[in-house]
Amino acid sequence: MPIIEQVGAREILDSRGNPTVEVELALTDGTFARAAVPSGASTGEHEAVELRDGGSRYGGKGVDKAVQAVLDDIAPAVIGMSADDQRLIDQALLDLDGTPDKSRLGANAILGVSLAVSKAAAESAGLPLFRYLGGPNAHILPVPMMNILNGGAHADTGVDVQEFMVAPIGAPSFKEALRWGAEVYHSLKSVLKKQGLSTGLGDEGGFAPDVAGTKAALDLISSAIEAAGFKLGTDVTLALDVAATEFYTEGTGYSFEKETRTAEQMAEFYASLLDAYPLVSIEDPLSEDDWDGWVSLTTQIGDRVQLVGDDLFVTNPERLEEGIERGAANALLVKVNQIGTLTETLDAVALAHNSGYRTMMSHRSGETEDTTIADLAVAVGSGQIKTGAPARSERVAKYNQLLRIEETLGDAARYAGDLAFPRFALETK
């Protein structure tokens, strides 16, 4: 039985130069593990609370309070517990915090410990993390949803949609999918240069040109796909993260592309996109609390495209259950730091899958070199992962880990491909 012997924590920097929490954990059998916590730019109102220091240090974004919460509160509570009882440990963390949003200890402190425990337990058992968490049947490699053009809160441009993604659904393996995505990424750079547009990068490694709007961006990416030698819709298809909460004002509506629009008008816009482009997924097309709009949108186009709830669900089983009951969205975006423990994350994924919802594993805009989400995507069989462009080491680290997992699985590995979008990919062919 691997017993937790030591727990340490420190403040490190994420990919945006902001502080975040790193936790180290040692077991009595000599096993050591480390986990680092990501942070988002466009954060949902209902996410678990990150504990930040305030004051002048790091512009108020320091995490010394969260580090001390690990050292002073969490460590004494979990030392002596068995690392292979993840659910019991995570429940102890929740009980210790005692708040519904993890605001006392901080979700960043709690998650760091939760993830470090799972990694230590896997190492102690002599298993890769994906196998330890997913069991003997974990073998599906996810489609990389590569954010190659950044807008919204991830870029300083006039483009309202936050992420324009390519999905190499026609590739025969994850290794080839990664190559296809990288080739499209470089092709897009050439397309942008030829048109005199900026090739500067946004938070997640995608290009951040100041283009006219959504359709102009999709046209650029479509051209890049074809210029790279791939067939649009069959080999490589398109996806969006609109992050609509960022431009929604209660009582006013959606301030989108220089117009104020209702949820119904946004729905009409998305329907027009589906008529013109091979889109398989739209994330956060409406605001996080626009339940009626979400239900109506899902009724109208939910049979044509994957509608992913990010800010809507915040990886929270309770909000997801409400969405399922209402008929809002048909897929869940999975971000471990939105909910704050591994157990709650796994519960949300299980609820989604058992209810016929797809899942997409996701990074945050403020990332680290930690690769846990790559293993987690394979462990739960998400079939989709969103972890940025094939550029910047904090993004590529996850893709490279998936390459290693595919090699480890050998002949047992299966790339999700268009089966990740069983109802929608067929319409693109």
Curated annotation (Swiss-Prot):
The GO terms this record gives for MF are:
magnesium ion binding; phosphopyruvate hydratase activity
Which keywords annotate this record?
Cytoplasm, Glycolysis, Lyase, Magnesium, Metal-binding, Secreted
Task: Please name the pathway.
Answer: Carbohydrate degradation; glycolysis; pyruvate from D-glyceraldehyde 3-phosphate: step 4/5
Known cofactor(s): Mg(2+)
Q: Which GO terms describe its biological process?
A: glycolytic process
Q: Which residues form the active site?
A: E204 (proton donor), K335 (proton acceptor)
**What EC number is given for this enzyme?**
4.2.1.11
Catalyzed chemical reaction(s)? (2R)-2-phosphoglycerate = phosphoenolpyruvate + H2O
Pfam families assigned to the protein according to its UniProt record, in alphabetical order: Enolase_C (PF00113), Enolase_N (PF03952)
Q: Enumerate the residues binding Mg(2+).
A: D241, E283, D310
- Cross-referenced SMART domains, in alphabetical order? Enolase_C (SM01192), Enolase_N (SM01193)
Under Gene3D superfamilies, the record lists:
Enolase-like C-terminal domain, Enolase-like, N-terminal domain
Q: InterPro entries annotated for this entry?
A: Enolase, Enolase-like_C_sf, Enolase-like_N, Enolase_C, Enolase_CS, Enolase_N
UniProt feature coiled coil, ranges: none
Compartment(s) where it occurs, according to its Swiss-Prot or TrEMBL record: Cytoplasm; Secreted; Cell surface
| Positions bound to (2R)-2-phosphoglycerate | Q162, K335, R364, S365, K386
Q: How is the cofactor bound?
A: Binds a second Mg(2+) ion via substrate during catalysis.
Q: Which GO terms describe its cellular component?
A: cell surface; extracellular region; phosphopyruvate hydratase complex
- Assigned protein family: Belongs to the enolase family.
| Record function comment | Catalyzes the reversible conversion of 2-phosphoglycerate (2-PG) into phosphoenolpyruvate (PEP). It is essential for the degradation of carbohydrates via glycolysis.
The molecule here is called Enolase
Q: Which gene encodes it?
A: eno
